[in-house]
């Protein structure tokens, strides 16, 4: 593992540690034992489970299923770079490779796991991890392909100029969301890129959006990790009491961002305090 990849993994795990330091005691004090009322999976407060969750081997929060698959994808990133940087690489071939992996995830893995010799493996941590990594791999790899071949720049070149671009972008975004609704997550690798491009191009001209995005960006990973505590572990009555789905989303976003900002600045302040103590100690030694 390169130093850069190791640092990214450490930074990602540090987010998880900081959230767990705050929210595990809250869960424990409130007596939370299940992710939700219908779940058979229970939270384990023993030392081993907490440590394994902090390292990504177990999911303390059920919505954190992506932690270990993402770490594996980071570890695999140098291999993906080598594949994309091979001689005579081209977009069409790379796209076919991603499509093949996606089809294998959609049809091959379920068929493979149905064989008697793999039935027991399917439900294990490693079996679930394998399925999740293969599912996420096309999306992750296609993002790298988009970057290598500057696909967004190509979109920009073929997009109508001026005010005519907005109906096209709106159609692409709406079509993407509709296809996602109809097809589910199986073809995310193909849909996400155009959807992101269309949405970004539609809103980036709105005054203040870029500034807000930059300010909110520092909290977004915390929001990603924290929001499910309010939805699935505690706070459901408050969050869902608003009834209207749009209001529920807005309230959840506000609560999650406020919590994320509090956690961010708490640990930022602690980090600065530790640095000052170290500097003072070094001066006096």
Model segments located where?
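Hydrophobic transmembrane alpha-helices
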Residues: 73, 77-85, 139-152, 196-205, ...
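Membrane-interface helix-boundary motifs at transmembrane edges
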Residues: 1-7, 80-92, 148-161, 204-215, ...
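Alpha-helical transmembrane segments of multipass membrane proteins
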Residues: 19, 23, 27, 77, ...
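Transmembrane alpha-helical segments and their boundary/interface "anchor" motifs
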Residues: 1-59, 73, 161-168, 215-225, ...
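Residue-level signature of transmembrane alpha-helical entry/exit and packing/kink sites
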Residues: 3, 12, 66, 94-95, ...
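Interfacial loop-to-helix transition and helix-capping segments at the boundaries
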Residues: 54-69, 109-139, 173-197, 241, ...
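Alpha-helical transmembrane segments of multi-pass integral membrane proteins
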Residues: 166-275
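Hydrophobic alpha-helical segments with transmembrane-like composition
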Residues: 27-31, 42-112, 127-142
